[in-house]
Amino acid sequence: MEWEQEQVKTDVLLENVCDNYMKCIQMIKETDLEEVCSHIYHAKRLFAYGTGETQHAVTQMIKRMFMNVKRFFVTLYGKTELMMTIEDLSEEDMVIMISLSGENELAVQAAKKLKARGVYTLSITRLSDNTLARLCSKNLYIPTECSD
């Protein structure tokens, strides 16, 4: 009986994960990425910042993926690196900011400074109205679902 309950829980979790992937794929298919691709192609310098360990791991994946097309991202880690870099950025640069909630205080503060400097920014956050997405030039939303 207990094993059957665990199996049902596992099956539901697997179904939720699969549904989440399907939603992500559908959202990406429906999103016009031409503007983002153009900025990645034309930017003088490219940067990526993630608010936590998982988000930083995503910035590392972005960095590796774009090496194949000779576009090199600098991944920023921590407050000092982020804030020092912002002071040197201009309209010719691009920054990708990754945050689950889009409400991380440091990311929001950085996005405000980047916007004031005219830097093109792309946020990647969960599908919700959030401060980071409102501050960035373009937003990509990732459907997320919490499971117990």
Protein language model regions, located:
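Short, flexible segments with low predicted structural confidence
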Residues: 10-12, 37, 85-86
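Alpha-helical scaffold segments in soluble metabolic enzymes
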Residues: 20, 35, 109, 113
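Glycine-rich phosphate/diphosphate-binding loops that line cofactor/substrate pockets in enzymes
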Residues: 31-44
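Glycine-rich phosphate-binding loops that contact phosphosugars or nucleotide phosphates
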Residues: 41-148
